[in-house]
């Protein structure tokens, strides 16, 4: 338990910390990487350069300080972050390193005095223990599953399939010939890469793009312009190569009774977690609607597969939007609507108040979808979404 004195001090000084803004997290990361450069093998340095990770940390610090007397309000965020941490193999010792640099940053930028530093130190220790406990439980759960493991495990690339001009699928099988653990549709894998051309080890999370299988995992990756890892996977990784994988994780997953209707909404490579869900919903007892937006036919991954499912199963329907169709793209055959996703076009399919919505894509797209769902009076508990990269509140 956190002492009342600590709660009072943290809440009183939280506005001062908040006013420091991005300067605080920039100083923190610079300090930490200077003193502990080995952590560059864990943190996504691309997210450091674009500021996403700094923003995420700053938001987390402010949220914790503002809710220090109501930790239950933080549990959803704790669950999301804890799953991500397990895919990075974060350890209790690393929490000590981070805490030390966070307190030193507050001291160096604000000079608040020892009493304030002690209060923030106590508060950080309590939160760190919450994460350490939850993450250890996830590690144990992953290890105890049939086909499960702790840490990383060597896998061999057995199939590489181009799904569109920008998306390629990679299927991995355990190098030891064993089985793989089950996962929940919507979850992701952590992949660890250390090519000679990389300055640091690179760790990325990619959504699993099929329903669970017993002997392999499939991810589908978009080639990002300037993306170090995605371009390496597309250009360099070949069948027979090996990689290290962390066990599946993630708090965004299909979790509804078989009688609950579901709508899956995606844009671009955001279809990967929802495709895993669709793959698992072929025997669902309620309606399933697949709504997907992409640039045009050359970017449209898994078109034939999704259409085959929609033709085969009466409870599955599929609707597609192309933002800028090519001259060769045929309306009503290759796509249904032009432009951005407009849920009014399929409003008759979305009238059941029990329906759950799962969506993923670029942040702007998800904000667009969330706004429309709210306008349709969809209950917040029925809305689920995933951000690729640091989480953002829509």
Swiss-Prot record:
Domain of life (superkingdom): Bacteria
Catalytic reaction(s) noted: 2 nitric oxide + NADPH + 2 O2 = 2 nitrate + NADP(+) + H(+); 2 nitric oxide + NADH + 2 O2 = 2 nitrate + NAD(+) + H(+)
Annotated site (Influences the redox potential of the prosthetic heme and FAD groups): 84, 386
Claim: NADP is one of the keywords in the record: yes
E.C. numbers: 1.14.12.17
Catalytic center residues: 95 (charge relay system), 135 (charge relay system)
Recorded family membership: Belongs to the globin family. Two-domain flavohemoproteins subfamily.
Domain notes: Consists of two distinct domains; an N-terminal heme-containing oxygen-binding domain and a C-terminal reductase domain with binding sites for FAD and NAD(P)H.
Name of the protein: Flavohemoprotein
Gene designation per UniProt: hmp
């Amino acid at each position: 338990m956190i002492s009342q004195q600590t709660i009072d001090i943290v809440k009183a000084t939280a506005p001062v910390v908040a006013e420091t803004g991005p300067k605080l997290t920039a100083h923190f990361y610079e300090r930490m990487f200077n003193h502990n450069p080995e952590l560059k093998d864990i943190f996504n340095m691309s997210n450091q350069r674009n500021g996403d990770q700094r923003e995420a940390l700053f938001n987390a610090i402010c949220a914790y300080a503002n809710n220090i007397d109501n930790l239950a309000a933080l549990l959803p965020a704790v669950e999301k972050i804890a799953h991500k941490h397990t895919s990075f193999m974060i350890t209790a010792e690393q929490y000590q390193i981070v805490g030390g640099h966070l307190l030193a940053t507050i001291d160096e930028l604000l000079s608040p005095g020892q009493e304030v530093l002690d209060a923030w130190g106590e508060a950080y220790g309590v939160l760190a223990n919450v994460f350490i406990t939850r993450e250890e439980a996830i590690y144990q759960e992953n290890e105890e599953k049939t086909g499960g493991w702790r840490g990383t495990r060597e896998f061999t690339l057995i199939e590489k399939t181009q799904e569109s001009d920008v998306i390629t699928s990679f299927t991995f099988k355990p190098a030891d010939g064993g089985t793989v653990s089950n996962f929940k549709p919507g979850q992701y894998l952590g992949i660890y890469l250390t090519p000679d051309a990389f300055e640091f080890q690179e760790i990325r999370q990619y959504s699993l793009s099929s329903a669970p299988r017993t002997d392999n995992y499939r991810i589908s990756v978009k080639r990002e312009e300037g993306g170090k890892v995605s371009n390496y996977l597309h250009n360099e990784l070949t069948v027979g190569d090996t990689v290290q994988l962390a066990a599946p994780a993630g708090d965004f997953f299909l979790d509804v009774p078989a009688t609950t209707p579901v709508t899956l909404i995606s844009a671009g490579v955001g279809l990967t977690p929802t495709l895993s869900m669709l793959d698992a919903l072929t025997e669902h007892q309620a309606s399933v609607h697949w709504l997907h937006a992409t640039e045009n036919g050359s970017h449209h991954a898994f078109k034939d597969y999704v259409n085959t499912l929609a033709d085969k199963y009466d409870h599955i329907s599929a609707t597609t939007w192309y933002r800028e169709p090519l001259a060769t793209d045929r309306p009503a055959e290759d796509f249904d609507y032009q432009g951005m996703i407009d849920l009014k076009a399929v409003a008759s399919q979305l009238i059941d108040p029990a329906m759950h919505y799962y969506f993923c894509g670029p942040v702007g797209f998800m904000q667009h979808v969330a706004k429309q769902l709210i306008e349709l009076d969809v209950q917040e508990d029925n809305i689920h979404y995933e951000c690729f990269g640091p989480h953002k509140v829509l």
